[in-house]
Structure formats: C-alpha cells, structure tokens
C-alpha cells in the first residue's frame, strides 16, 4: 500500500469539496478546480478529510493510489493558498515586463518574446529581472514557468539565461587556449 496514499487529505474550513464518482470539484477562496481521477481508485469524504483508496488490489490500481491522493491535496492547497514559481533573468540587456496580461521577455534575440498566459495564470515582474508565475493549479503554474525558462535556458559558461530562483547552474571551464 502507498505510504503517501493511505494518509487522509485534511480539508480546511474555507474549502468545499464535492465528489461525483471519480470527478473531484474543489472550491475555495482563490477559485475553483475540477479534475477527473483515473480508474482504479475510489474517493470518499469522511468528516473534514478526503480518503483515497485503491479500488482493487491490481498493480495499476496500487500505482495510481498515491498519485491521486497527491493530486487532490494539491487541488485543495491551490484553491486555499495558491502556488507561485519565481524565475530570475541573468545577463546584460535581458529583462522582462508585463504589458496588459502578456509577458514580454527581451532575452538576447533580435525580437522580444511575448507569452500570453492561459486562464488562471498571472505573470508579475519585479526589478525587470524577476518573473513570478502564479495561479491555483500547481501543474499549470509549473508548466508555464518551464515555458518561460525555455525561452533562454541558462548556459553553463557564464550562467546567462532564465533560471528558477535558487537553481544552481553547473558551470564549465572555458577553453584554456594555446600557450
């Protein structure tokens, strides 16, 4: 049995959860999320807790047990507190700004790169070099942050590019040259 999956998910007072078969709807102060869980698990509500259990003892059911529990926990955390990911832009002349809702990144290309956020995601820029991606869906926040980083991933020689806050870049030595 999954060590993560067997723990019940506590539901805060400000959050309401409704179950319809394998569809879980979570509503909280930050918004509302809905997700259909894969087959092989059963979801039930006891008091102020959500319990996820494998519906059969087959392997695919046991594999999805911990995953589904974590997905439900992430939904509850997202509508209650939200998620955010910070990125740093390193390099001379590289900067970002928000125009309306669109993120505009100047990262050393001949043109600025524009990113339109999907529904539920907001971009915020501090000091022209720090981008904060925030929203209530953890998966969507992570995907959008990865797309921003992919505009100009950090290079190993000088460390220039877009990196996650706190990310350590493995540095390489340059050519030593002829003597």
From Swiss-Prot:
Gene Ontology molecular function, alphabetical: rRNA binding; structural constituent of ribosome
Keywords linked to the UniProt accession: Ribonucleoprotein, Ribosomal protein, RNA-binding, rRNA-binding
Ribosomal protein as UniProt keyword: yes
Highest taxon in the source lineage: Bacteria
InterPro entries documented for this protein: Ribosomal_uL6-like, Ribosomal_uL6-like_a/b-dom_sf, Ribosomal_uL6_a/b-dom, Ribosomal_uL6_bac-type, Ribosomal_uL6_CS
One cellular component term from this protein's GO annotations in UniProt: cytosolic large ribosomal subunit
Protein's GO biological process: cytoplasmic translation
Kinase listed as a keyword: no
Xref: Gene3D superfamilies: Ribosomal protein L6, alpha-beta domain
Function: This protein binds to the 23S rRNA, and is important in its secondary structure. It is located near the subunit interface in the base of the L7/L12 stalk, and near the tRNA binding site of the peptidyltransferase center.
Subunit structure: Part of the 50S ribosomal subunit.
Family: Belongs to the universal ribosomal protein uL6 family.
This protein's name: Large ribosomal subunit protein uL6
Source species of the chain: Parasynechococcus marenigrum (strain WH8102)
Gene that encodes the chain: rplF
């Amino acid at each position: 049995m999954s060590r993560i999956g067997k723990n019940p998910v506590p539901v805060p007072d400000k959050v309401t959860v409704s179950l319809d078969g394998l569809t879980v709807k979570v509503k909280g102060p930050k918004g509302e999320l809905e997700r259909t869980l894969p087959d092989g698990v059963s979801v039930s509500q006891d008091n102020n807790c959500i319990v996820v259990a494998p519906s059969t003892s087959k392997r695919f059911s046991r594999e999805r047990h911990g995953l589904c529990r974590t997905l439900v926990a992430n939904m509850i955390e997202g509508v209650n507190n939200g998620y955010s990911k910070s990125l740093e832009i390193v390099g001379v002349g590289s900067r970002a700004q928000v125009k309306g809702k669109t993120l505009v990144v100047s990262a050393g290309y001949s043109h600025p790169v524009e990113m339109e956020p999907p529904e539920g995601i907001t971009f915020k820029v501090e000091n022209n070099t720090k981008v904060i991606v925030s929203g209530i869906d953890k998966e969507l926040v992570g995907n959008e942050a990865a797309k921003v980083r992919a505009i100009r991933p950090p290079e190993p020689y000088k460390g220039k590019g877009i990196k996650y806050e706190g990310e350590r870049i493995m540095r390489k030595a340059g050519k030593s040259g002829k003597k």
